[in-house]
Amino acid sequence: MKVVLVAPAAALISLLGAVPAAADPGSGPSYAPPFVDHTEWVYWGGLSSLRVYPTPSGRAASRMSGTAGADPQAADKAWSEVLARSPDADTPGMRAQFVCHWQFAEIGQPGKTSWNLEPWRPVVDDAQ
């Protein structure tokens, strides 16, 4: 009977001991660059759109945006990765669209294949 009780208890203890590193506030974030896998320009009806494909780490970092454990520079690092892959994205309004996706895409539509940025959209600043 002891063996029957000890085995499940040992299994439970090992599971409880396997807490992810992110659960320890002193260990830092559980994500790291690269945040962007690749980008791709596409055209629909004469309008261009930049598809940004985040990495799993990018998705994790974006979900942390605005929380106590978040890296406040993560969105800037990710935007730098976008510009490294698609320098033409450096136009008015594109960074604001990216930051909007960074903050809300994984909440509104988790796991969406790409975050789509459109340079033809009106420029909206943070105050709007």
Give the label of every model feature segment.
Residues 1-39:
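N-terminal prepro-regions of secreted/extracellular proteins
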Residues 44:
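Extracellular/periplasmic catalytic domains that process cell-envelope and extracellular macromolecules
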Residues 78-128:
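Extracytosolic low-complexity repeat regions of secreted or lipid-anchored proteins
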Residues 39, 48-52, 56, 124-128:
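Charged, amphipathic alpha-helical regulatory modules used
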Residues 21, 50-51, 115:
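A broad, low-specificity signal marking well-ordered, structured residues that form hydrophobic/aromatic
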